[in-house]
Every structure is written in structure tokens, then in C-alpha cells.
């Protein structure tokens, strides 16, 4: 079956760190089929012992939505094998086109499902933290269509989470600086995430429900990028400082 075959191909690309062609011609798929491919892709990881630990949101800036010709967000799944310890290191040989972006992460203390208000979403939050996501499209030349990126787990490949803070901490408009070896490479604000990151959490509950899923207690939700993603290179220290939330870091090894 085409859906299963594509999921296997994308899984092999992620495991090997080797690029794969876009889903064109006989492999072209619809958005609905792409969502099923993503589910099967993650199932391969779970079969190898990983656990699903949350979701990541994508297209959380109006500019990115316009670029992709869409009017809504997309989401991908976070698994335990994607979690990079704060202060740890990653081997870039395991990635295809690795890039990093600063984010806000929510930890849910209660189940969240369906159409909820921002206040209801906040009531389900147990803690908030600064975070970074490592994105890595498995497609050649980092080029993809909307179905392509959905099938490829919304390009999500890894994430780092900093120290947790009380849920009432205001994260709606916090300054963020991402640096490589002490040199700033991106400056931004959490307000770039849909005007406020809580809107991404609201959207996560809605979009998950559309596929028959809920955001369970204990889930991590990456709200989306606060700046453009920056390409990673070997042998650097990556640091993100977030106003009022502190900093987090990781380093890179390997060859590209």
C-alpha cells in the first residue's frame, strides 16, 4: 500500500540521515493521506521503543502560512527519542538538513481536548519553559509541499527544554536571543507565535481532536518558532536566552 510504503521511506530517511525525494508523481498524496503517513511514521519509532510525549505546532507565523498558502497550523508528534538533554550534544551526522529555532514549551497537568478557550487552555497547564526545536526536513534541498511536510512529522526531529516555571508565568511577549558560540544569530519575541503562544496551545487541542486525539496530562506542547530557523553546523554551542525564563543550550558534533 502506498501510504505504508511512503511512511517506511520517510522513517528510513530519518534513521539514516539521508535525503529522500519529495512526494510527487505516483507518490503524491493528499493532506488527509499525509496525516496517516505521519501516524505510521511515528508508529515505526514506537515499535523501536520510543514513546509519544507530546506535540509540536508548525506554521505559527502569518508569514509562514502565507508562504505555504495555508490558513491554519500544522502539527507533528514528539517522541522520547527526540528529547535532547539540556546542555547535551547532538551528532549532526544523524540529520539531513538540521536547523534550530527558539520556542516556548507547555507541560500539561490536565487533559485538554477539542475547542477550548485560552483560559481553559491555561487552566490545563502545569508549567512553562524555554525550549529549542531541531527541525530537519528529510526531503532533498529542504523543499516540500504542504502534504510533504505533514507526512514528514512537520519536520520535527529533536527538542531541548529548559527549566520549568509556574503556569501563571506570562509568556505572551518575551524577548528571545539565540546564539552560536556566543554570537547572536536570531533575535525575536514569543509574541511572534500567533501573537501569544497560548493560541498555539488552543490550536493544538482543536487540531488533535480533528484526528480523534486529545492532549493528555503530562504532554509537552511546543508552541512554535519565535524566529526563523537557523542551519546548524558541527562543533558549535547553541544557546537560547528567554526573558524571565532563563537560558538553555546544547552543542553539536559530527560532520555535514
Swiss-Prot record:
Its EC number is 4.1.1.77. Its cofactor is Mg(2+); Mn(2+). Optimum pH is 7.5. Stable in the range of pH 5.0-8.0. Stable up to 35 degrees Celsius. It holds the Pfam family FAA_hydrolase. Strongly inhibited by Fe(2+), Fe(3+), K(3)[Fe(CN)(6)], Ag(+) and Cu(2+). GO terms for biological process: catabolic process. Belongs to the hydratase/decarboxylase family. Involved in the modified meta-cleavage pathway for the 2-aminophenol catabolism. This is 4-oxalocrotonate decarboxylase. The lineage of its organism: Bacteria, Pseudomonadati, Pseudomonadota, Gammaproteobacteria, Pseudomonadales.
Amino acid at each position: 500500500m502506498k501510504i505504508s510504503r511512503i511512511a517506511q521511506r520517510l522513517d528510513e530517511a530519518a534513521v539514516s540521515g539521508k535525503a529522500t525525494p519529495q512526494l510527487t508523481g505516483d507518490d503524491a498524496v493528499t493532506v488527509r493521506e499525509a496525516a496517516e503517513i505521519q501516524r505510521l511514521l511515528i508508529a515505526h519509532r514506537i515499535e523501536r521503543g520510543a514513546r509519544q510525549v507530546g506535540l509540536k505546532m508548525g506554521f505559527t507565523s502569518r508569514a509562514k502560512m502565507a508562504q505555504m498558502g495555508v490558513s491554519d497550523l500544522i502539527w507533528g508528534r514528539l517522541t522520547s527519542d527526540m528529547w535532547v538533554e539540556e546542555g547535551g550534544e547532538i551528532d549532526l551526522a544523524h540529520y539531513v538538513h538540521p536547523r534550530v529555532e527558539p520556542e516556548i514549551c507547555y507541560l500539561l497537568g490536565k487533559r485538554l481536548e477539542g475547542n477550548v478557550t485560552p483560559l481553559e487552555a491555561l487552566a490545563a497547564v502545569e508549567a512553562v519553559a524555554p525550549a529549542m526545536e531541531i527541525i530537519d526536513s528529510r526531503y532533498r534541498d529542504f523543499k516540500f509541499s504542504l502534504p510533504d511536510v505533514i507526512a514528514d512529522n512537520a519536520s520535527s526531529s529533536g527538542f531541548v527544554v529548559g527549566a520549568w516555571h509556574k503556569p501563571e508565568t506570562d509568556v505572551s511577549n518575551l524577548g528571545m536571543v539565540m546564539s552560536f558560540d556566543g554570537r547572536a544569530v536570531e533575535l525575536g519575541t514569543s509574541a511572534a507565535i500567533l501573537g501569544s503562544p497560548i493560541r498555539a496551545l488552543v490550536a493544538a487541542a482543536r487540531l488533535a481532536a480533528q484526528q480523534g486525539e486529545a492532549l493528555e496530562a503530562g504532554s509537552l506542547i511546543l508552541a512554535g518558532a519565535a524566529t526563523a530557523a537557523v542551519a546548524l553546523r558541527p562543533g558549535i554551542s547553541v544557546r537560547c536566552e528567554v526573558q524571565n525564563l532563563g537560558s538553555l543550550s546544547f552543542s553539536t558534533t559530527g560532520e555535514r
